[in-house]
Amino acid sequence: MVRALTFDVGNTLILASPRFWLLPLLEARGLRPRGDVRKAALEAFRFYEENHLKARDLETALGLWREFHRRLLVGMGLEDHAEALSRELVARWKDPATWPLVPGAEATLKALRAKGYPLAVVSNWDATLPEILEVVGLGRYFDHLSVSAVSGYAKPDPRLFREALEALGV
């Protein structure tokens, strides 16, 4: 018997690949990556993963995202635009267009909610996640958010999962 369900966010609920949120912005500005986008993204996400636990408050988290975007843009060969675009991207952090949803994510959560399942997020993310989930319209579906930077430990640490399960009464 299923008693509760947990979800990750990146590439489960929100599309995390730069091709969904960064490349359209660059195209709109007439900019084309000159470097290896995939390699730049892997390195930027590695930087984020290594530093996100420090981002327990919004100011620190937004600084982390600014540096993430700057590194990503530099890695893509867009050094001349990296500072300005990284500031712009961080300024848009509450814009739902910045966080495109995985197709079917909201419908799935809605259906699970309608069936009465307790739902939680368990994600390696920073302090921005609760507000991001609200602006994209997904926050209302969750009974609990276990966010690594807020909790102080990251997956695969079982404490993050345990926190969610205890909050759901499982």
What are these regions (language model features)?
Residues M1, A114-Y117, A167-V170:
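Glycine-rich phosphate-binding loop signature in dinucleotide/nucleotide-binding domains
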Residues V2-P103:
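N-terminal helical cap/lid subdomain that shapes the substrate entry/recognition surface
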Residues L13-I14, L129, A154:
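Catalytic P-loop NTPase motifs of RecA-like helicase/translocase cores
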Residues L73, L133, L165:
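ABC transporter ATPase nucleotide-binding domain signature
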Residues E83-V136, F142, S146-S148:
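Substrate-recognition element of Asp-dependent hydrolases with the DxDx(T/V) motif
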Residues V150-G152:
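Histidine-bearing beta->alpha loop at or near hydrolase active sites
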Residues A154-V170:
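Conserved Lys-Pro-Asp/Glu-containing loop-to-beta segment of HAD-superfamily phosphomonoesterases
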